């Protein structure tokens, strides 16, 4: 008997605004749910978050409690979560749900995020191409916080620099940094699935594994890889409260003249984060905004 095929799941379908994607995925992952997908096209702001929960483990009251845990995440954006749709389904290939809607995604003037299973469209032949198959790690380049980082890399290319990518997800920021001239990228993520996805995408982009080295962990793991050396640029696209916790250890990674691109924060969270960073001896050079999301460009004083 094929026990995997016999499994049944509650499939959650939840329409969401793009501002909520990152926070909801973070929360669901933190709750131990890893069968997740987001359906959307790059040109369409309408998105549907999908999650699969083992039906034998999730009663109606458990599912109601899950939604109660998710609803507060919409409040900082002045939004309310839509009503969820629950459907009991047989085992299905959940990882393919988002693939059917993902198309080639031009970013800025020079970069193209290309799904691994699609051919390069001729109209984008002059762009730097980053091929991605995120698997179960999120980071397709479509989220505003990711795009802020990608566009910042294009505006100020990291030519010849050594780069650290903290919270790398699918590896998209590291691949873009290399495309724009970085010498080497050291990447880390606390999610094992993200580490696996980044390593697989390194091979997909035909890169030497030493040019983009991926480790499991956080600042300490990157510091160990550096063996007493430092990087010139830190990319950190994670939620603002996490940046605040990690910020005191950024000195372990960055050189005296190093810069950081800190994204994943709401614009209204920027003043508090700026205050925290300045108290630690950092200078905030500028805040770039895209919708309600922001990116802080920081350097040492």
Swiss-Prot record:
| Annotated organism of origin | Prochlorococcus marinus (strain MIT 9313)
Q: Name the GO terms of the biological process aspect.
A: methylation
| Family, per entry | Belongs to the methyltransferase superfamily. PrmA family.
Among NCBIfam families, the record links this protein to:
prmA
**Annotated compartments:** Cytoplasm
The intrachain disulfides are none
* GO CC terms, sorted: cytoplasm
- What is the annotated role of this protein in its UniProt record? Methylates ribosomal protein L11.
Q: One GO molecular-function annotation for this sequence?
A: protein-lysine N-methyltransferase activity
Keywords on this record?
Answer: Cytoplasm, Methyltransferase, S-adenosyl-L-methionine, Transferase
The source's superkingdom equals Bacteria
Which reaction is the catalytic activity of this chain? L-lysyl-[protein] + 3 S-adenosyl-L-methionine = N(6),N(6),N(6)-trimethyl-L-lysyl-[protein] + 3 S-adenosyl-L-homocysteine + 3 H(+)
Pfam families noted in UniProt: PrmA
Return the InterPro entries for the record.
Answer: Ribosomal_L11_MeTrfase_PrmA, Ribosomal_PrmA_MeTrfase, SAM-dependent_MTases_sf
Chain positions recorded as S-adenosyl-L-methionine binding sites: 146, 167, 189, 237
Q: Which residues form a coiled coil?
A: none
EC numbers for this chain: 2.1.1.-
Q: What is this protein called?
A: Ribosomal protein L11 methyltransferase
């Amino acid at each position: 008997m094929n026990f995997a095929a016999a499994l049944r799941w509650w499939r959650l379908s939840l329409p969401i605004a793009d501002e909520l994607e990152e926070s909801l995925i973070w929360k669901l992952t933190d709750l131990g749910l890893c069968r997740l997908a987001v359906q959307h096209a790059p040109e369409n702001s309408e998105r549907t978050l999908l999650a699969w929960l083992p039906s034998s483990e999730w009663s109606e009251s458990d599912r109601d409690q899950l939604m109660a845990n998710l609803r507060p995440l919409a409040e900082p954006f002045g939004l309310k979560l839509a009503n969820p749709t629950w459907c009991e389904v047989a085992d299905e290939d959940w990882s393919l749900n988002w693939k059917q809607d993902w198309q080639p995604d031009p970013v800025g003037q020079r970069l193209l995020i290309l799904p691994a299973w699609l051919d390069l469209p001729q109209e984008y032949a002059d762009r730097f191409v980053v091929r991605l198959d995120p698997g179960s790690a999120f980071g397709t380049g479509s989220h505003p916080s990711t795009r802020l980082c990608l566009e910042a890399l294009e505006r100020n290319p990291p030519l010849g620099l050594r780069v650290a990518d903290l919270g790398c997800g699918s590896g998209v920021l590291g691949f873009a940094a290399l495309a724009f001239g970085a010498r080497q990228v050291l990447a880390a993520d606390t999610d094992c699935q993200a580490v696996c996805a980044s390593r697989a995408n390194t091979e997909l982009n035909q890169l030497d594994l030493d040019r983009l080295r991926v480790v499991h962990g956080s600042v300490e793991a990157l510091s160990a890889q550096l063996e007493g050396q430092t990087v010139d640029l830190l990319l950190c696209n994670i939620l603002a409260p996490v940046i605040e916790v990690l910020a005191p250890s950024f000195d372990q990674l960055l050189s005296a003249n190093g810069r950081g691109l800190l994204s994943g924060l709401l614009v209204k969270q920027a003043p508090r984060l700026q205050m925290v960073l300045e108290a630690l001896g950092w200078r905030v050079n500028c805040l770039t905004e895209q919708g309600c999301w922001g990116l802080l460009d920081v350097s040492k004083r």
